[in-house]
Amino acid sequence: FSVFVKKYPDCAAICGNGQPRLATLLLLDFLKENHSFYYHGDFDPEGLLIAQRLKERYGERLRLWNYRADWYERYLSDVNLSEVRMKKLEKVYLPELLEVKMQMQKRKRAAYQEAMLDMLEPEKNEWITRSVK
């Protein structure tokens, strides 16, 4: 996160560090009337559930950033997901997350956002380039 905000100081960013806490939710609630958000988190069962909850809370104001099977495959870690963690995927139903969910059910591994930093750059993502300028 710090690398991203230092590299792109004109891009407003919020780091929630895992499960969004009350302060993060209150800030987003305050901003939601006049702002749209892009969310990116870990590609693991818990991360998909966070993305789903945020999408449910903020609807069209929140866009999920690159929750795609090709990103999941590209950034797979060596972290194997336990059966307890895999069971959490049963609660993921949001259409935007199903592609990643299905791949995760096959591979049983996580992909973490820290590994994706090279692709979280405005010039590689047209939508954020427009937001930054």
Enumerate the language-model features and the residues they cover.
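Acidic beta-strand-to-loop metal/phosphate-binding motif
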Residues: H35-D44
